[in-house]
Regions:
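Bacterial Sec-dependent signal peptides at the C-terminal "C-region" and cleavage site
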Residues: 21-30
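Low-complexity, Ser/Thr/Pro/Gly-enriched N-terminal "stalk/linker" regions
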Residues: 29-101
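Aromatic-lined, polymer-binding surfaces characteristic
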Residues: 43-45, 55-59, 63-67, 78-85, ...
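Surface-exposed intrinsically disordered loops and tails
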Residues: 87-102, 260-274, 507-524
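Carbohydrate-active enzyme catalytic cores, enriched for enzymes
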Residues: 233, 282-466, 627, 632
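Catalytic and substrate-binding regions of extracellular carbohydrate-active enzymes
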Residues: 380-631
Length: 632
């Protein structure tokens, strides 16, 4: 639903809504930390001293995970073969938006290789001592390394994620004792060279679908391989110069990652992106895996030096909307590059991640560990997934002695709003029950991973999704992702329509038709300035200035937003256009078609209903837009 006003100069809008140890030769002083890296193998995730504990867990609380791992390893082939490393073929594909040709930005098939399975077989060998598993792991590594080099020769990425290659490096470390020097060299030298080849650099070839994501992202692309490559090969006498370089560069990147994430967390908790599919998916692996491998290679637990990371479960808790119809599938208000099809919170790895937070922070921050335990116990899957096969043998199992908070303590928290500064998210709620009212407001983000052009946007949930983030990312080959879903028009924001204004850039397929060239009144990259935030047991008040985001077409774009507990909202906008002829629009998106009666709009979704009363401007025109042919 759009409220459109084309008067000159300034528009003022107000809406009330009711709802819901190795010493490196020749290192300098800055590399003194290298002296703490142990000389022996294994040293990645566990070492000679901690291995008995790992094995004891495998024979005790994690026995089921061990038995399942052994069964998988028994089914793996004796002679593993890799595939799908040939040249990428560009072709015509059909999408919801029509037919177009794939490009270097289009997702491609991953190389079929055996890095992850080699790590499993390496663990199986260490658990059982049976040489058949050692031989499987060795052959898998040799075959995979050859495939990595073939893929590079064909200018294609092995995988968007570094996971399987990190595990290949771990597998080498874990079976090192069982290999001859020649066997070690045959694996580690080309493996480390592959890691070097795929790093970006002057004069190097472009690689199709290579993930170069740095510390601001999930850090699961090719830069993340450096630490593990260096740690696996350091001091082995085969490629020492490259190993030392990787170790140093990887260590530097990982420390920058930890600082970036710790600083971004603030005093409330955040993790690089406000999109749960990322922050509750693969993003935590980067810091946890560095914590694990630093601990196993040096004996030092770094976690206490980064206290902000302990707070991430707090963001999960505030993002979480209890689902009355299916308690195992909590909801959230929808944000950024998540699909927005069900707005289901990404809890598939909730047990795994919360168990990690407990493992590393239970002594440094007992309260955060208790909250993590509370969320862990609500995870629908009470086990650790097998992406990182060593995880079940390092932590988890609920034997950590951390007492979760009671339901009453979680449901009756007196605080009704939280400002996650780094994410630019204000989360408001009347309680923490299925029938409570939930709301988000977006302003002032400094962490912009997978964030849209949506400053001053709000969403409302009461029994169901009432004021929503619209659009969906689809399968990453549709034009909707770039030209609607990510743009201001898909959000509950203000538009100032200047004719033929270039559309802001976003990722996704490029459309060369006229619809793909021009902005529809939205904002550009940047962050709004938060002017005020106050919360108490009666109301929450937010004021935010997004003027600068609209560029020269805008003289003022200030939104004041009030949540009157439990379920009334007031939205007041001051909007000024530099050109009086530029149209202005106030957007509100619903799941279903609303009913408009005079200046009142009513929208239903499930058991929820939103009443929207337009107060100002006096001559506002209310217009419904949507339905077949006007979905975007």
């Amino acid at each position: 639903m759009k409220t459109v006003q084309k008067r000159k100069l300034t528009v003022r809008l107000a809406v009330a809504a009711s709802a819901a140890c190795m010493v490196c030769m020749g290192t300098g002083q800055d590399d003194a930390w290298m002296a703490s890296i142990r000389r022996d193998h294994p040293r990645m995730f566990f070492n000679a001293e901690t291995w008995p504990q790992v094995k004891a867990r495998a024979e005790g609380p994690a026995r089921a995970a061990r038995d399942t791992l052994l069964k998988r390893c028994d089914k793996y082939p004796e002679k593993p073969v890799c595939s799908d490393y040939g040249p990428v073929e560009f072709r015509e594909v059909k999408t919801a938006g029509g037919t177009h040709k794939t490009t270097a930005a289009t997702p491609i098939k991953n190389v079929k290789e055996w890095g992850s399975q080699a790590a499993e077989c390496a663990l199986a060998w260490r658990f059982t001592g049976e040489r058949k598993y050692l031989e499987k792991a060795r052959r898998m590594l040799e075959s995979s390394v050859a495939a990595y080099h073939a893929a590079y020769a064909n200018r294609r990425a092995v995988n968007w994620y570094s996971t399987s290659r990190i595990l290949a490096l771990c597998a080498y470390d874990w079976i090192w004792e069982g290999l001859t020097p020649d066997e070690r060299k045959a694996i580690i030298v080309p493996l480390v060279q592959h890691v070097e080849d795929i790093q970006p650099g002057k004069g190097k070839p472009a690689i199709i679908r290579r993930d170069l994501g740095g510390i601001e992202s999930g850090f699961y692309g090719v830069p993340s391989l450096l630490w593990y490559s260096g740690l696996a090969s350091y001091g082995d006498g085969f490629c020492d110069n490259l190993a030392t370089s990787h170790l140093r560069r990887g260590h530097n990147l990982c420390l920058k990652l930890l600082k970036f994430r710790n600083d971004g967390a603030g005093d409330d908790g955040a993790l690089s992106s406000a999109v749960p599919g990322y922050s509750m998916g693969a993003y935590p692996w980067a810091h946890f895996n560095f914590f694990h491998t630093w601990l196993s290679s040096t004996g030092e637990n770094l976690a206490s030096k980064y206290p902000g990371l302990a707070l991430f479960p707090n963001w999960i808790y505030w993002t979480w909307i209890p689902n009355a119809s299916d308690p195992s599938m909590p909801l959230y208000c929808g944000f950024g590059d998540d699909p927005h099809t069900q707005n289901a919170l990404s809890v598939g790895r909730l047990y795994e991640h919360t168990a990690q937070y407990i493992h590393f922070f239970r002594e440094a921050n007992p309260a955060a560990a208790r909250l993590a335990a509370s969320l862990r116990d609500r995870a629908p899957a009470q086990y650790i997934l097998n992406t990182w096969p060593v995880y079940p043998f390092l932590f988890g199992g609920g034997d950590d002695g951390v007492k979760p908070y009671s339901d009453a303590e979680l449901e009756n928290l007196p605080l009704h709003a939280r400002h996650f500064e780094g994410l630019g998210q204000f989360i408001m709620r009347s309680g923490w029950k299925p029938d409570s009212t939930y709301c988000t407001f977006t302003a002032g983000a400094s962490l912009r991973q997978h964030k849209h052009y949506d400053e001053n946007n709000f969403t409302i949930y009461k029994h169901d999704f009432l004021a929503i983030d619209s659009g969906t990312r689809g399968v990453e080959t549709d034009w909707n992702l770039r030209y609607y879903y990510s743009q201001t028009i898909a959000h509950n924001c203000i538009l100032i329509r200047r004719p033929k204004e270039p559309i802001p850039a976003y990722w996704g397929p490029v459309y060369n038709g006229p619809e793909g060239k021009f902005n529809d009144g939205g904002m550009y990259k940047g962050s709004a300035k938060v002017l005020a935030f106050e919360t108490n047991d009666k109301f929450t008040y937010i004021a935010s200035d997004a003027t600068s985001l609209y560029g020269s077409k805008c003289t003022e774009a200030v939104r004041q937003f009030v949540h009157l507990l439990p379920d009334t909202f007031v939205v007041y906008d001051r909007v000024g256009a530099a050109n009086a002829n530029d149209g202005k629009a106030w957007l509100l998106h619903f799941v279903n078609e609303p009913r408009v009666d005079g200046r009142c709009t009513v929208a239903d979704c499930g058991k929820g209903r939103l009443f929207c009363e337009t107060i100002l401007p006096a001559d506002a025109k209310l217009e419904k837009i949507g339905g077949p042919g006007k979905e975007f």
